[in-house]
Swiss-Prot record:
Keywords: Aminoacyl-tRNA synthetase, ATP-binding, Cytoplasm, Ligase, Metal-binding, Nucleotide-binding, Protein biosynthesis, Zinc
Molecular functions per Gene Ontology: ATP binding; metal ion binding; methionine-tRNA ligase activity
Name of this protein: Methionine--tRNA ligase
GO BP, one annotated term: methionyl-tRNA aminoacylation
Catalytic activities: tRNA(Met) + L-methionine + ATP = L-methionyl-tRNA(Met) + AMP + diphosphate
Gene this protein is translated from: metG
Quaternary structure, from the entry: Monomer.
Source organism per UniProt: Streptococcus pneumoniae (strain CGSP14)
Statement: the UniProt record of this protein carries the keyword Transport: no
Role: Is required not only for elongation of protein synthesis but also for the initiation of all mRNA translation through initiator tRNA(fMet) aminoacylation.
Length: 545
């Protein structure tokens, strides 16, 4: 089976924060899991380097768009690598290949009569002498009344036309823009209404999408799909490849989602592979993103793929709700955020991955608090998992000269461990990463109870053979837990591999024992509880500057 996984493309206009990681981490868990199962996996993403957000940042910093995009693309790649993300290709939308393929796709849709031109009213800033891209316009959302950008409301997730905003202002100069006429290409979304309704019903019946994706997509389809502009008068982006329109750019929402396909082509060309191995009706596809990206993955991208007759359509939609910070909405403009390139310097990547998974905003908003993060690390990763491994292996190292006993106990504890592979695997495949990790740590608690109940320290005096069997059983548990946790917290898994000089890279139950331990080391260090107040204070101070 081939597995395609697409992670949402962050805008290269500012650093990544913990909210980005919470939404994107399920993609890496899926990729690692399926690779361990032996499936063919293609996991792609990239930096969104076109469109308005980068232009706004460039204007503010008096830099070129390329300088801004280059800086953040490099930072993104390094940050994802430090967090253990295993993209097969992390690309960017300003690459020549992306531009070339998007223009080809645009022409294919034009030739198929899915694109047509239309004269429209668009906002123009007389002070800055330019048509305003949607994100250059701010005002009140006409649906819910909250402050919004011109392209989409963060509060109600509505896709907007900036002309409909109330109290419109140019985000560059804060002046009120005027309405002028311009001509653009439109995509015939209305022709795909019935197809998308069938597509949605199938996803709902088979429970392949999260509820927020089902409900939001239902709302859009119930309201009826309007045709939408696919070109804009933008300062940067991909030029429209048709005479008379070459000064216009292909709208970012169209070309950014096409990045999943262009990155796949790029990967295939680099490795001399066949793109159709992953773009066919037998491939299982996952799209991993935040709640605000739902319509782009459940309506826009499926409609474009259908027009191009490219398969598969997005099958699994792993759409996270929002992550708050200390019970307040993350705000990059107010610096109320924990930046990934900062937290990764101070804390173990596995600690970050663990907390953002066990506390994931899968079905409802979740909160990141420094207290919970540090207590979670100390009590679960260190206190439960790390302690079980350390006390078992230190016992073997001290009393058996690191020689691992050869005979283990068959019983309920190992039967449950074998069954756990199926339980966790099914949960991961259906996108329930939080519950999968909870199941593993529930088992870890039972493993600690097994150790305490069997009392190997007492058996060493009264029944040395039984003591060896208990320790060997615990080693089997450690090996399988290390392997099963690899998709979630891979860096600790590597430490376990090093201690046993073995590989933990399949999704099959391990029953063979290694002969000898290498140097035993702690998987995790305790975090001083004083860090809680220090981190909260730093957050408050930086956000008030």
């Amino acid at each position: 089976m081939s597995i395609f996984i697409g992670g949402a493309w962050p805008y290269a206009n500012g650093s990544l924060h913990i909210g980005h990681a919470a939404a994107l981490l399920p993609g890496d868990i899926l990729a690692r899991y399926y690779r361990q199962k032996g499936e063919e996996v293609l996991y792609v993403s990239g930096s969104d380097c076109n469109g308005t957000p980068i232009s706004i940042r460039a204007k503010k910093e008096n830099k070129s768009v390329k300088e801004i995009a280059d800086f953040y693309h490099k930072e993104f790649k390094e940050t994802f690598e430090k967090l253990g993300f295993t993209y097969d290709l992390y690309s960017r939308t300003d690459s020549p290949l992306h531009h070339e393929i998007v223009q080809e796709l645009f022409l294919q849709l034009y030739e198929k009569k899915f694109l047509y031109t239309k004269k429209i009213k668009q906002l123009y800033c007389t002070f800055d002498n330019q048509f305003l891209p949607d994100r250059f316009v701010e005002g009140k959302c006409p649906n819910c009344g909250t402050h919004s950008r011109g392209d989409q409301c963060d509060n109600c997730s509505a896709i907007l036309d900036p002309i409909d905003l109330v109290d419109k202002r140019c985000s560059i100069c804060s002046n009120e823009p005027e309405v002028r006429e311009t001509e653009h290409f439109y995509y015939v979304f209305s022709e795909f209404q019935n197809l998308l309704e069938t597509y949605l019903n199938d996803a709902e019946e088979t429970v392949r999408w999260r509820k927020n994706a089902i409900n939001l997509t239902k709302r859009y389809l119930r309201e009826g799909l309007p045709d939408r502009a696919v070109t804009r008068d933008l300062p940067n982006g991909i030029p429209v490849p048709i005479d008379g329109f070459r000064d216009k750019k292909i709208y970012v929402w169209f070309e950014a989602v096409a990045g999943y396909y262009t990155a796949s082509v790029d990967w295939a060309q680099k490795l001399q592979n066949n793109i159709t191995d992953f773009w066919n009706n037998r491939t299982k596809s996952y799209y991993v993103h935040g709640k605000d990206n739902i319509p782009f993955h459940t309506i826009i991208w499926p409609a474009i793929l259908s027009g191009l007759e490219i398969e598969p359509l997005p099958e699994y939609i792993i759409s996270s709700e929002y992550l708050t910070l200390e019970n307040k909405k993350i705000s990059t403009s107010n610096n109320w955020a924990i930046w990934l390139n900062d937290i990764i310097k101070k804390y173990d990547a596995d600690s970050i991955r663990y907390f953002l998974t066990i506390n994931a905003p899968e079905m409802k908003d979740a909160n990141f608090s420094w207290r919970e993060f540090i207590y979670s690390h100390n009590s679960e990763l260190l206190g439960s998992y790390g302690n079980f491994i350390n006390r078992t292996l230190k016992f073997i190292e001290k009393y058996f000269e690191s020689e691992i006993p050869t005979k283990y106990l068959e019983g309920e504890i190992l039967y449950n461990l074998k069954e756990l592979y199926t339980t966790v695997g099914n949960l991961v495949e259906s996108g329930h990463m939080k519950q999968a990790l909870e199941e593993i740590f529930e088992y870890i608690r039972s493993a600690n109870k097994f150790y305490d109940d069997m009392k190997p320290w007492a058996l060493r005096e009264s029944d040395i053979e039984k003591c060896k069997e208990v320790l060997a059983t615990c080693v089997i548990i450690i090996l399988n837990l290390g392997q099963m946790l690899n998709p979630f917290i891979p860096f600790s898994g590597k430490k376990i591999e090093d201690m046993f000089k073995t590989k933990l890279n399949t999704w099959n139950y391990i029953s063979n024992l290694p002969n000898k331990l290498s140097d035993v080391s702690m998987l995790f260090d305790r975090i001083d509880l004083k860090k809680i107040d220090e981190e909260v204070l730093e957050l408050q101070q930086t956000s008030s500057r």
